[in-house]
């Protein structure tokens, strides 16, 4: 039995959830999100709570149970609070600047990198070495952060590169003479 899946998802005031044609739509103060529903589980919306139950007792249905409940919770959290990730840039001459719909990155290459900011994502650079990514879709925020980080992953000798805020970079000792 799924410990996560058996808990119903509370729908706070100011948020409306609607199930129609195999799609769950959630509308809140920050915006609107929707996701296709899985046929492995059933969804019931009653008394300001959305509960998820597996269709049958197969391993596949049970594994989808907790995941689908978590995805529904992520939708509701996104339209009420939103999600954000912070990236830190370390290295001499490494910097970032937000210019309209693009993020300009200088990461030690012979050219600057212009990253197009996707729809529904806001990127702020309070400092040249800090990038704040925010939005209502948890998956999209994480994907954008991973794409930016991929341009220059932190290296283990000096720690230069782009890392998530709070991420531990395993450091190696250099060659001994």
UniProtKB/Swiss-Prot annotation:
Coiled-coil parts of chain: none
Gene3D superfamilies reported for this sequence: Ribosomal protein L6, alpha-beta domain
Protein keywords: Ribonucleoprotein, Ribosomal protein, RNA-binding, rRNA-binding
PANTHER family: 60S/50S RIBOSOMAL PROTEIN L6/L9 (PTHR11655), LARGE RIBOSOMAL SUBUNIT PROTEIN UL6M (PTHR11655:SF14)
Family statement drawn from the similarity comment of this UniProt entry: Belongs to the universal ribosomal protein uL6 family.
Reported function: This protein binds to the 23S rRNA, and is important in its secondary structure. It is located near the subunit interface in the base of the L7/L12 stalk, and near the tRNA binding site of the peptidyltransferase center.
Protein's name in the database: Large ribosomal subunit protein uL6
Gene, per the UniProt record: rplF
């Amino acid at each position: 039995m799924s410990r996560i899946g058996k808990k119903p998802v509370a729908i706070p005031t100011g948020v409306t959830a609607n199930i129609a044609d195999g799609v769950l739509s959630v509308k809140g103060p920050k915006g609107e999100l929707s996701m296709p529903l899985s046929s492995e589980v059933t969804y019931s919306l009653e008394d300001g709570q959305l509960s998820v139950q597996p269709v049958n007792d197969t391993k596949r249905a049970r594994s989808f149970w907790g995941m689908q409940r978590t995805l529904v919770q992520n939708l509701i959290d996104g339209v009420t609070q939103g999600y954000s990730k912070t990236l830190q840039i370390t290295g001499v001459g490494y910097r970032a600047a937000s210019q309209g719909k693009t993020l300009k990155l200088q990461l030690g290459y012979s050219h600057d990198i212009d990253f197009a900011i996707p729809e529904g994502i806001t990127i702020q650079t309070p400092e040249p070495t800090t990038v704040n990514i925010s939005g209502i879709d948890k998956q999209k925020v994480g994907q954008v952060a991973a794409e930016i980080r991929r341009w220059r992953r932190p290296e283990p000798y000096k720690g230069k590169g782009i890392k998530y805020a709070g991420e531990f970079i395993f450091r190696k000792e250099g060659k001994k003479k």
